[in-house]
């Protein structure tokens, strides 16, 4: 039986958190304590990342989403749950919700991938570039002690990496060592077009994006609103792509607002 790491804390209605590329469920650690005051919060390591076994060869969104649902069930996470997905995790969360709407009460997309597809050749090129960048990030932990090093290591993730604590950046970088399916996942989500899936989803939808996000396209919130006029949308001020790390309090406030709006 394949292993899915599921870390559950708190009591209340179930809330599932799905992380993005090149990291693990630890990406949520700055917001989990606040969320767990009123919720049972389950953060996972996506199959092929952290301590979770891959879902077969490569990275198939449907297969990975299915493995996530099965692993949550084995861990005793009750359905239906509110499902939150960040970046790659947004594409996976949407895929899971579309395949198994009975398992999901509401869906929250945080700076989601899968809504602005790129051509397959470009996606493959991005994947090859990741093969160079990810090792640098994995073994660049000593650079976190310098402001310029934190900026380099967190390029694209936050507005100013130097503003993060060295220990925070070091932990994020080290978590990349367990991201075994990063290249395959990057190619899969870059080429994915899940817009029709989102438009047709028979579940309430919310979205959160950092005001300074440089990874997802600037018009992503507009795209979501066009596809889902009923979506509850929030922007996290002064935050980039990893808003839950850069502005944890603001992120929690935004997420709680969205969850109330879609409940």
Language model regions located:
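Active-site loop/oxyanion-hole signature of alpha/beta-hydrolase fold enzymes
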Residues: 9, 33, 42-85, 98, ...
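Acidic catalytic loop of the alpha/beta-hydrolase fold
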Residues: 212-216
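Catalytic histidine-centered segment of alpha/beta-hydrolase-like enzymes
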Residues: 239-252
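Conserved HGGG/HGGXW glycine-rich cap/lid loop of the alpha/beta-hydrolase fold
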Residues: 4-54
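Gly/Ala-rich beta-loop-alpha elbow adjacent to hydrolase catalytic centers
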Residues: 85, 89, 93
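Conserved alpha/beta-hydrolase catalytic His-Asp/Glu region
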Residues: 141-200
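Short beta-strand/loop motif that positions the catalytic acidic residue
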Residues: 201, 207-209
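Flexible "cap/lid" loop of the alpha/beta hydrolase fold
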Residues: 98, 105-138
């Amino acid at each position: 039986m394949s292993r899915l790491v599921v870390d559950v804390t708190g009591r209340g209605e179930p809330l599932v958190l799905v992380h993005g590329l090149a990291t693990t469920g630890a990406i949520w650690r700055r917001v989990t304590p606040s969320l767990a005051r009123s919720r049972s919060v389950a953060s996972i390591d996506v199959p092929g990342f952290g301590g979770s076994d891959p879902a077969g060869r490569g990275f198939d969104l449907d297969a990975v989403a299915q493995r996530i649902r099965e692993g949550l069930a084995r861990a005793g996470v009750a359905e239906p749950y509110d499902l939150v997905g960040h970046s790659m995790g947004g594409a996976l969360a949407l895929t899971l919700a579309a395949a198994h709407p009975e398992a999901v009460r509401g869906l929250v997309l945080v700076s989601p991938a899968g809504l602005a597809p790129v051509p397959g050749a470009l996606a493959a090129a991005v994947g090859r570039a990741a093969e160079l960048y990810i090792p640098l990030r994995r073994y660049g932990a000593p650079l976190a002690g310098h402001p310029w090093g934190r900026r380099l290591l967190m390029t694209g993730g936050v507005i100013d990496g130097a503003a993060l604590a060295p220990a925070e950046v070091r932990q994020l970088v080290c978590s990349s060592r367990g991201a075994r399916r990063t290249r395959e996942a990057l190619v899969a989500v870059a080429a994915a077009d899940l817009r029709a899936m989102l438009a047709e989803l028979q579940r309430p939808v919310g979205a959160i994006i950092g005001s300074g996000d440089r990874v997802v396209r600037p018009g992503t919130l507009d795209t979501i609103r066009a596809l889902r006029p009923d979506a509850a949308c929030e922007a996290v001020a002064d935050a980039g792509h990893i808003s839950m790390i850069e502005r944890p309090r603001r992120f929690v406030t935004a997420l709680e607002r969205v969850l109330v709006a879609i409940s």
